[in-house]
Protein backbone atom coordinates (compact mmCIF):
# COMPACT_ATOMS: atom_id res chain seq x y z
CA UNK A 1 0.00 0.00 0.00
CA UNK A 2 1.12 3.53 -0.70
CA UNK A 3 2.12 5.69 2.23
CA UNK A 4 0.06 8.74 3.11
CA UNK A 5 -3.03 8.14 0.92
CA UNK A 6 -5.17 6.17 3.36
CA UNK A 7 -7.40 7.83 5.97
CA UNK A 8 -6.53 7.50 9.64
CA UNK A 9 -8.25 4.50 11.21
CA UNK A 10 -9.51 4.96 14.76
CA UNK A 11 -9.86 1.73 16.74
CA UNK A 12 -11.81 3.52 19.46
CA UNK A 13 -14.39 5.51 17.48
CA UNK A 14 -17.48 6.42 19.51
CA UNK A 15 -20.94 5.85 18.03
CA UNK A 16 -23.70 7.93 19.64
CA UNK A 17 -27.36 7.17 19.00
CA UNK A 18 -30.27 9.59 19.32
CA UNK A 19 -31.71 7.34 22.06
CA UNK A 20 -28.64 8.02 24.22
CA UNK A 21 -26.83 4.72 23.68
CA UNK A 22 -23.09 4.85 22.95
CA UNK A 23 -20.67 2.14 21.93
CA UNK A 24 -17.11 1.82 20.64
CA UNK A 25 -16.18 0.54 17.19
CA UNK A 26 -13.49 0.99 14.56
CA UNK A 27 -13.91 3.66 11.90
CA UNK A 28 -12.18 6.32 9.87
CA UNK A 29 -14.22 8.91 11.80
CA UNK A 30 -13.49 9.66 15.45
CA UNK A 31 -17.17 10.15 16.37
CA UNK A 32 -20.33 8.96 14.59
CA UNK A 33 -23.91 10.12 15.28
CA UNK A 34 -26.78 7.81 14.27
CA UNK A 35 -30.56 8.12 14.64
CA UNK A 36 -31.28 4.47 15.36
CA UNK A 37 -29.26 1.58 16.79
CA UNK A 38 -29.78 -2.00 17.96
CA UNK A 39 -31.00 -0.76 21.37
CA UNK A 40 -33.92 1.22 19.90
CA UNK A 41 -34.60 -0.40 16.49
CA UNK A 42 -38.00 -2.19 16.41
CA UNK A 43 -36.46 -5.34 14.91
CA UNK A 44 -34.18 -5.82 17.92
CA UNK A 45 -36.54 -4.53 20.63
CA UNK A 46 -39.63 -6.43 19.48
CA UNK A 47 -41.74 -3.28 19.72
CA UNK A 48 -43.47 -1.91 16.67
CA UNK A 49 -43.51 1.75 15.76
CA UNK A 50 -46.27 2.92 13.50
CA UNK A 51 -45.43 5.68 11.07
CA UNK A 52 -48.29 7.86 9.90
CA UNK A 53 -48.17 7.41 6.13
CA UNK A 54 -51.92 7.77 5.63
CA UNK A 55 -51.63 11.49 4.95
CA UNK A 56 -48.95 10.91 2.35
CA UNK A 57 -51.06 8.37 0.48
CA UNK A 58 -54.10 10.64 0.54
CA UNK A 59 -52.05 13.56 -0.81
CA UNK A 60 -50.73 11.37 -3.63
CA UNK A 61 -54.22 10.17 -4.55
CA UNK A 62 -55.57 13.72 -4.49
CA UNK A 63 -52.63 15.10 -6.50
CA UNK A 64 -53.10 12.62 -9.34
CA UNK A 65 -56.91 12.61 -9.25
CA UNK A 66 -57.19 9.06 -7.98
CA UNK A 67 -59.69 9.84 -5.21
CA UNK A 68 -61.92 6.87 -4.51
CA UNK A 69 -64.96 8.88 -3.43
UniProtKB/Swiss-Prot annotation:
Binds 1 zinc ion per subunit. Keywords: Metal-binding, Ribonucleoprotein, Ribosomal protein, RNA-binding, rRNA-binding, Zinc. GO terms for biological process: translation. Its cofactor is Zn(2+). One of its GO terms (cellular component) is ribonucleoprotein complex. Zn(2+) binds at residues 17, 19, 37, 40. InterPro entries: Ribosomal_bL28/bL31-like_sf (IPR034704), Ribosomal_bL31 (IPR002150), Ribosomal_bL31_A (IPR027491), Ribosomal_bL31_sf (IPR042105). Belongs to the bacterial ribosomal protein bL31 family. Type A subfamily. Part of the 50S ribosomal subunit. NCBIfam families: L31, PRK00019.1, PRK00528.1. Binds the 23S rRNA. This is Large ribosomal subunit protein bL31. It comes from Caldicellulosiruptor bescii (strain ATCC BAA-1888 / DSM 6725 / KCTC 15123 / Z-1320). The gene is rpmE.
